[in-house]
A protein has these predicted regions:
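Alpha-helical scaffold segments
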Residues: 1-210
Length: 210
């Protein structure tokens, strides 16, 4: 068995095992750079699958279709063409949807702001800005709300002042307009109050220097 990275067709002619002879990738009209086990869509380890699609991104779209095993489709979706990624946004597999969100056009991912899976919503929040994130301000997932607090425009931040997560309020204390800082001045979390105090002190110093 050869150990050189080469095309599937060459390895087949070199006498590899049945798993390579029957490989659907090998039957494609275009060659793929692969290696059994370490750079293969059917590798036992996920790393080997991802390595294959990193080396052969053109196979991402072709191998994200439903007839492929889920673990193959999840890795393939990360390399799928952005226009095909739109079709994967409604895939039953949450990991495929999450990868599709990262590649699909922004206008296509808006409905997934209310996806049942928090991982998918996190991926959505990391791509959107401003008013597109308003409906995610009350998301039940803490990570989603933290991302939202860091990406909405500052004039929207007062809408999140009642959040019960101190991490969200820390972001608010750093970003919110100074006119709202007094609302957070008596926050139950010490470091939130410290951030507010630091900003207020700076504001007073700036006024005195003028």
């Amino acid at each position: 068995m050869t150990t050189d990275k080469t095309t599937c067709a060459v390895r087949h002619d070199s006498g590899l095992g049945k798993e390579c002879v029957d490989c659907r990738i090998r039957g494609a009209p275009w060659p793929a750079q692969c290696h059994p086990g370490s750079m293969c869509p059917f590798a036992h380890r996920t790393m080997g699958i991802h390595r294959f699609f990193r080396g052969n991104p053109s196979f991402g779209t072709r191998c994200a279709t439903p007839e492929w095993p889920d673990r193959v489709r999840r890795a393939a979706a990360a390399r799928a063409h952005p226009y095909y990624a739109s079709e994967l946004l409604h895939d039953p597999d949450r990991h495929v949807r999450r990868q599709a969100v990262k590649r699909a056009p922004l206008g296509q991912i808006l409905p997934l702001r209310e996806d049942a899976c928090a991982l998918v919503r996190v991926a959505v929040a990391r791509r959107l800005f401003g008013s597109d994130l308003i409906i995610m301000m009350d998301d039940p997932d803490l990570t989603v709300r933290r991302i939202v607090a860091s990406r909405v425009t500052t004039h929207m931040l007062p809408l999140m002042l009642g959040d019960n997560d101190p991490h969200v309020r820390r972001v608010l204390a750093r970003r919110i307009d100074a006119s709202w800082l007094t609302v957070l001045a008596e926050d139950p979390t010490a470091d939130v109050r410290a951030i507010v105090a630091g900003r207020l002190q700076w504001a007073v110093s700036a006024m005195c220097s003028d």
